[in-house]
C-alpha cells in the first residue's frame, strides 16, 4: 500500500514517470515488486550497480572495437553512473594534431571538463578518441557523437591557444 506523504508540491502515489525522452510519461505501479522492472522497461535503471554494469559493458565493447584501452577511471565511472538513468556509452574522435599538446592538458579537458574517458593504445599513449556516456539512446547517435566532438574540439582549441601563449613566456 502507498504510504501517504508530501515533499514540496509532490504527493506519494502509485504513478511515476519513465525516462524523460524514451519512457512513458505515466507509469502506474501496483506493487513494490514491479517497481524496478516497470521503470527498466521505460529506460530507467534504478539500481546504480546495474547502471554501472551496463556502462562498463558498453565501455569494454568500445575498447575492443577500437583495439585500445578505455581509461575508465573509477571516480569518473561512478560520477557518470549517478548522472544518468540509462547509460549509453559512445565514442568520438578528435584531430590527431591535438595529440601534440601535453597529455595532462588533454586528459584534464576530457576527464574533468567533459567527463569523457581517454582512450589509449597498447603502448599506453593517448589515441585520438574519447568515450562519453549519454543518458539517451538517440535514434541518431551520430548527432550525439558529432555534438560531443564539436564541444571537445572547441575545448582543445582553447587549450592549444593558452598552451602556446604560456610557451611565449619563459619561466625565469
Segments from the language model and where they lie:
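His/Asp/Glu-rich acidic catalytic environments and adjacent acidic regulatory segments
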Residues: 1-168
Amino acid at each position: 500500500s502507498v504510504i501517504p506523504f508530501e515533499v514540496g508540491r509532490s504527493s506519494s502515489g502509485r504513478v511515476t514517470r519513465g525516462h524523460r525522452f524514451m519512457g512513458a510519461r505515466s507509469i502506474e505501479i501496483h506493487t513494490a515488486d514491479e517497481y524496478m522492472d516497470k521503470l527498466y522497461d521505460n529506460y530507467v535503471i534504478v539500481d546504480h550497480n546495474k547502471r554501472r554494469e551496463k556502462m562498463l559493458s558498453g565501455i569494454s565493447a568500445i575498447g575492443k572495437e577500437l583495439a585500445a584501452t578505455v581509461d575508465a577511471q573509477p571516480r569518473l565511472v561512478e560520477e557518470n553512473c549517478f548522472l544518468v538513468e540509462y547509460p549509453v556509452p559512445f565514442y568520438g574522435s578528435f584531430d590527431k594534431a591535438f595529440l601534440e599538446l601535453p597529455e595532462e592538458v588533454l586528459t584534464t579537458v576530457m576527464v574533468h571538463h567533459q567527463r569523457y574517458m581517454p582512450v589509449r593504445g597498447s603502448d599506453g599513449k593517448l589515441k585520438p578518441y574519447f568515450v562519453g556516456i549519454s543518458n539517451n539512446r538517440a535514434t541518431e547517435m551520430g548527432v550525439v557523437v558529432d555534438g560531443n566532438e564539436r564541444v571537445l574540439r572547441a575545448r582543445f582549441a582553447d587549450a592549444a591557444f593558452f598552451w602556446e601563449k604560456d610557451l611565449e613566456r619563459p619561466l625565469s
